[in-house]
Design a protein with these regions (language model features):
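Active-site catalytic pocket residues across diverse enzymes, especially alpha/beta-hydrolases
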Residues: 37, 41, 125, 133, ...
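Glycine-enriched alpha-helix->loop->beta-strand junction motifs that scaffold or abut catalytic
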Residues: 111-113, 174
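Core active-site phosphate/anionic-ligand binding loop and the adjoining beta-turn-alpha structural block
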Residues: 134, 139-217
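General beta-strand structural signal in soluble alpha/beta enzymes
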Residues: 74-76, 83, 91-92, 115-117, ...
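Rossmann-fold NAD(P)-binding glycine/threonine-rich loop
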Residues: 94-110, 117-158
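N-terminal glycine-/serine-/threonine-rich beta1-alpha1-beta2 phosphate-ribose binding loop
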Residues: 2-110
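Short, active-site-adjacent cap segments at secondary-structure transitions
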Residues: 64-65, 122, 178
Length: 217
């Protein structure tokens, strides 16, 4: 089943069996995902019926210092990681389009369910990814890629199933929302708040997709 953004991930395992997770990308988002998987381990186990075990983290540069992270988990071979037998769920937070597309397709075709926060990837290749998920029986979760990860896709599908939505109005990019709100409330200028958004990790090192509207589109 693909594009499943309404149900909790079901790994299809018996009660108490562990769920193997692979994380692709260890920037601001990936690092936070890894932290939360450890900090909220008991909550996740209670929700899915078994413990979560991080099996590996794929990065572009293995030589970069990563304090507090087991070096045995780090790999620069994302393709081998997502195809491992002990990996059930892949979390993609790499960014970009072409490379993550190839890795996510490899994961889905190997029967691994995927969670992605990559809105550019979903916008450009969502249909292809959904087809791959359908073919293998894997799940593709993309709620994290929509409207700054607020839970909106599931409610729109369920609660408004009988309605016709003519348009949606709002500032749907989190970085832009932060910048505009701060400019309005503090009187700071745009460049100052863009720099602050980057420092806080809200904006990427290259914020073009955020501030020029590509992510929102």
């Amino acid at each position: 089943m693909s594009t499943n953004n309404e149900a909790i991930f079901n790994p299809g395992k018996g009660a108490g069996e562990s769920v193997g997770v692979a994380i692709l990308g260890l920037g601001t988002v990936g690092t936070e995902v890894l932290r939360l998987l450890g900090e909220k381990a008991e909550d996740f186990e209670r929700r899915i019926g078994g413990p979560i075990e991080v099996k590996g983290v794929a990065v572009r540069d293995k030589s970069k210092p990563r304090p507090g992270i087991d070096p045995e988990l780090i790999t620069d071979d994302a393709f081998s990681l997502v195809e491992r037998d002990d990996v059930d769920l892949v979390v993609e937070v790499i960014g970009g389009i072409d490379y993550p597309r190839r890795v996510v397709l490899a994961a889905l075709r190997a029967g691994k369910s995927v969670v992605t926060a990559n809105k550019a990837l979903v916008a450009a290749h969502g249909a292809e990814l959904s087809e791959a998920a359908d073919s293998s029986g894997a799940d593709l979760f993309f709620e994290a890629a929509v409207a700054a990860a607020i839970p909106i896709v599931g409610p729109l599908r369920r609660s408004l199933a009988g309605d016709t939505v003519n348009k949606v109005v709002g500032i749907v990019n989190g970085t832009t929302n932060f910048i505009l709100d701060a400019m309005d409330s503090t009187g700071a200028d745009y460049d100052e708040m863009l720099a602050e958004a980057t420092r806080l990790g809200y904006a990427e090192a290259d914020p073009t997709a955020d501030v020029e509207g590509h992510d929102a589109a």
